[in-house]
Amino acid sequence: MNFFSDHRSKWIGRNGETFHSVDSPVLPAPYFRKVFPCANPAGVKIAICGLGYYELFINGRKVSENVLDPIVSQYDRRVRYVVHDLSDYLNAGENVIGVILGNGWYNCHTPEVWNFYHAAWRDYPRLLVEIKSENEEILRSNTSWKVTEGPIVFDGLRNGEHYDARLELGGWLSPAYDDSAWGNAKITAPPGGFLEAQTAAPCRITGTVEMKKINMFDVYDAGMNITGHARITVEGKAGAKVTLRYAERLTADGELSTYSQDKFIKGGDFQTDRYTLKGDGIEVWEPRFTYHGFQYVHAAVTGDCKISTLEARLVSSDLKSVGSFTCSSEMLNRLQDCTRRSYLSNFTGIPTDCPHREKNAWTGDAQLAVETGLFNFDGARSYKQWIDSFRDAQRPSGQLPGIIPNAGWNYHCGPAWDCALFV
């Protein structure tokens, strides 16, 4: 099925937001919705691109288990959309679509050394949607869509997410919801790159680990180093707050240590999520548009609130295991297990050097790990998609940067990095 070929679907954003400069204010996450009819749900598909990240709902149900979609690309050269089959989500008759957007890599609003803060493509989040079957055009994104702000009051890829449950939009995913107070979406400029379907393995939540409180500093331990985020179950009064800070190590006194990890972030929080309670019984929350590298979480409570459980949610590309190794040496078996977990922790759509400090896809690091990775996992589609970004980031002179995707930083790493294109 061919999508977006006639250019009638429009990139849309929130009315009243204008990105003037790199110092433009960080805005709450936009929430979009649209009621639409569908005569026959069979064979209906959606193509969606929400930059930087999106979460999609049809008739109140989240579509797919994917997270952190779409995977980052060189947005001024190539933009990925994702296709989902909606046959099992749609009704014959009235339906409603809901989409939440996060900043992701598209709007890296915190100053850092890799120049994404100054990326040529950087702008406020935007959305492109097309729903159709082989025989029927059903829905396109345009100014008839409704948009507002909601409980995600802040999100930053390397910072974290802030969620105020008192601002939740109860019932917004129902066709009958009254959205008359919402504004109409506005047409926004395209991000610059041409549209192409995402083919890499998606990121998903691949496991859940109960974290245990280990000391008087309210530090919780996952028992292993992971990539992902925390999910909390809390109860308390409206306005009480929980602040979650993430780290891989502890100081000798048992407090979190982010030494050497946060020094390249020049403003704002680092690996910190914040939740404000609505005061309505038991509340369960986890962030949508960020991820962290950690083993330990410091959970600080302000106000009348009690944390009943804190769980670590493992996030990585959902790569199928295709190889294994075992032997009579427990040390080597343990090393193999650590290697596999470390590899997955550093594959969130792109092969990264670390899941906390940078999250960047260093070409030299990736070319050293690719053989080990392909022995263990079916990563061919994901590497192929990433290699497309090499072409997009390459200068007319032939120069390649050390990290890809790239916002114009570090085009002089040398052969050990450049050779990743060939090996």
Regions inferred by a protein language model and the residue ranges of each:
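Extracellular/oxidizing-compartment recognition motifs
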Residues: 1-356, 364-365, 379-390, 396-409
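Well-ordered alpha-helical segments within folded domains of soluble proteins
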Residues: 363-374, 383-384, 415-423
